[in-house]
Amino acid sequence: MSKIVFIPLDERPCNYIYPDYIGRMSGLELSMPPKEMLGDFKKEADVEAVWEWTKGQVKGASHLVVSMDMLLYGGIVPSRLHHLPEAVCAKRLECLKEIKKLEPGIQIYGFQLITRAPARDGSGEEPDYYEDYGY
């Protein structure tokens, strides 16, 4: 049985629960961080805790499938709202090299969403200023 470490995009069921279901149906050992680490809507995940959790899970794993939005910014919505300096993001990205040192044979697959410009003026998933200055 292959062990896959999966870092989801965020805590929503389509990104957290469904992959777990698919893993179980497929007979894969799918390891995901506790949901509590992943933030909640506009509240970003505890990125450092997710990285530490990931480092502790990769031993013996064949693959790491990782949302770059999660591991760089703390989730999809926080990736749209962040004001992080480039140096912080670069430091977080360097953790992938550390993963490779911990488990040299692991295959790492990263994915990232492309930010969209919604055709509405709500601030629900967007920066608060969209309420007043949205599309």
Specify the residue positions occupied by each region the protein language model found.
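An N-terminal assembly and electron-transfer interface module characteristic of large anaerobic redox
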Residues: 1-135
